Amino acid sequence: MKNIRNFSIIAHIDHGKSTLSDRIIQICGGLSDREMEAQVLDSMDLERERGITIKAQSVTLDYKASDGETYQLNFIDTPGHVDFSYEVSRSLAACEGALLVVDAGQGVEAQTLANCYTAMEMDLEVVPVLNKIDLPAADPERVAEEIEDIVGIDATDAVRCSAKTGVGVQDVLERLVRDIPPPEGDPEGPLQALIIDSWFDNYLGVVSLIRIKNGTLRKGDKVKVMSTGQTYNADRLGIFTPKQVDRTELKCGEVGWLVCAIKDIHGAPVGDTLTLARNPAEKALPGFKKVKPQVYAGLFPVSSDDYEAFRDALGKLSLNDASLFYEPESSSALGFGFRCGFLGLLHMEIIQERLEREYDLDLITTAPTVVYEVETTSREVIYVDSPSKLPAVNNIYELREPIAECHMLLPQAYLGNVITLCVEKRGVQTNMVYHGNQVALTYEIPMAEVVLDFFDRLKSTSRGYASLDYNFKRFQASDMVRVDVLINGERVDALALITHRDNSQNRGRELVEKMKDLIPRQQFDIAIQAAIGTHIIARSTVKQLRKNVLAKCYGGDISRKKKLLQKQKEGKKRMKQIGNVELPQEAFLAILHVGKDNK
């Protein structure tokens, strides 16, 4: 056991985590040169296309160190994006140490800080690494100072390397072996294994990634899931070298995969503890804190025949993604679908794209909303995650919206722009600290504003230099209203949105104008209105298509023309009473982009 090292790699987006892991795999001979490709661990097509890591991946490698010993390295590559920070905390729970990778050109950014603090809270040994020293813009001395100044860990002898060229990666491994402590645990004790991650394989059933904390797991053992009390047979187990390799046992301190032929996707929840049925452990390991979704949106299949397939797909995805929440929902405009909870907009996009690609579904998304806390006049507190669930205005005593605490790191030059943006988003400044020419800003901004387009706008006002990390702080009373969209006097539930009263006029007007462009013209006038309760705040009309009934009257008598026009008018009126308006898919998407184009 003293030769096992469990660690994960944490860093801000694009600081070179995945490239560094490629190099480590290459040096330790995990893959032959022929099988080597860039970002080996980003196995999803989606990850490769966007160049981001979404799922944490684990690898077991053997490394012969300069002291002559051979060490077993179990390492986990983690995502850098704020929406996937729960993946990071899960991975860290399985490790004793973490490599903090910092780009020697960019320096410390918000996620670097957030992930590093997560690691420190879990008492992990953090080893700083300065990456990309081959870049002309690299300034390792300044960045080392920044790490000490902002993060507060000693970086005087931080390892310098360039994952792209491979310079210094050997030193990173040596430092790892030296500084990160071996796992603790009792190899002879009753088995306790933490489930770090699970995913569904069509042939094998549920595959779980586990970290053995105490005891040993052998092939053929009967294992028990502690939260459900169910027992299964350990059919196959092994490690990833990135390839799946079968083993006969997993020892104390190791990280590996396990297949128990579990067909039910909720059979092995992430964060649960496995133990042996014949000699169970007394208590479960502390799992992970459940992450609460921050953004909710309705997902509906375009054709109602896909509903069953959609339900199965969501089940399989939620196994792989512990933070995805979903419950059935029906809408008069869109039929049956699900109300899903996500961690942020990127997460929502990724899930939708994975559903469309991996499960071949066509989906419509409604506008994302956050969770509001509503106190009714009968003093009952309810949580509302969709505009249609909001009680009538006269039943609401107080409506509270979630406030996010946003930590931003940015160069001083962009401070003015960013403050203007935060104020526009109804933010309140709580802290501001200068570190050299960087500024650390802390603002409290309503979650609804953050999830809408705050991240994109922050990046564009600061030319991409500002970085953001946010977390939920509290609920706060606020003057929020529900804006309904009426089409020919009928409410369309899928288009309602909750917004602040100050913005409601603008949002309503914009939405109505957008809808006007998107709804095709019909044989009769279509009135599109935005309303708060019964009060109409904006209206526009899609003009009817009409035939020129006077074309055949040459010169002619005025009364003849009047008669024809009158006849046409009556026909249109009759049509309007029975006519239905077909809303195109783009109309539902328009609501996602309200307030984006006019900046």
Swiss-Prot record:
Reactions performed catalytically: GTP + H2O = GDP + phosphate + H(+)
Superkingdom field: Bacteria
Membrane association type: Peripheral membrane protein
UniProt keywords, alphabetically: Cell inner membrane, Cell membrane, GTP-binding, Hydrolase, Membrane, Nucleotide-binding, Protein biosynthesis
Coiled-coil segments: none
PROSITE patterns with a match to the protein in the record: G_TR_1 (PS00301), G_TR_2 (PS51722)
Pfam assignment, any one: LepA_C
Gene Ontology biological process terms, A to Z: positive regulation of translation; response to cold; response to pH; response to salt stress; ribosomal small subunit biogenesis
The keyword Membrane belongs to this UniProt entry's keyword annotation: yes
Domain tr-type G stretches: 2-184
Binding residue positions for GTP: 14-19, 131-134
Keyword Cell membrane appears in the UniProt entry: yes
One annotated GO molecular function: translation elongation factor activity
Enzyme Commission number: 3.6.5.n1
Compartments, record wording: Cell inner membrane
Purpose: Required for accurate and efficient protein synthesis under certain stress conditions. May act as a fidelity factor of the translation reaction, by catalyzing a one-codon backward translocation of tRNAs on improperly translocated ribosomes. Back-translocation proceeds from a post-translocation (POST) complex to a pre-translocation (PRE) complex, thus giving elongation factor G a second chance to translocate the tRNAs correctly. Binds to ribosomes in a GTP-dependent manner.
NCBIfam families cross-referenced by the UniProt entry: lepA (TIGR01393), small_GTP (TIGR00231)
Family, similarity comment: Belongs to the TRAFAC class translation factor GTPase superfamily. Classic translation factor GTPase family. LepA subfamily.
Protein name: Elongation factor 4
Organism: Escherichia coli (strain K12)
